[in-house]
Amino acid sequence: EGNIADYTGVDEVDMVVTLHACDTATDFALAKAVHWNAKVILSVPCCQHELNRQIKNEDLEPVLKYGLLKERISALVTDGLRAQYLEREGYEAQILEFIDMEHTPKNILIRAVRTGRKGENEDAIRRCEQALGVAPTLGWLLDHEGEV
């Protein structure tokens, strides 16, 4: 069993590709890609359980009380915040559907291309996290580089 957080020996890479890295494994891979200054990141997330366990918002409770809807909202928020963190770190990020839903419901691709221009979205990220009561692993990993 391996863990990308333990992977060393590479200083810089051109492209990082992740496919269905479960839950926070995607976050560890994205943080590693940012640390390596990857020129391109292509990430197809899998399950997004972390924020499903955390998300709380009194105004959204009438919707969040339904498990299926909470799961879907949590998945979308997770991937949206991932894209925002990548933009903060100097990437142009897009979220795309890469295959028809009839083939798999896990059809979201986060595509990020390094621009070197750091985003000015830190406050927006923090407000979103605070409003939803979430603390994504990717944010922590990027804010504490070298501590993992």
Question: What are these model-predicted stretches?
Answer:
Residues E1-V148:
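Class I S-adenosyl-L-methionine
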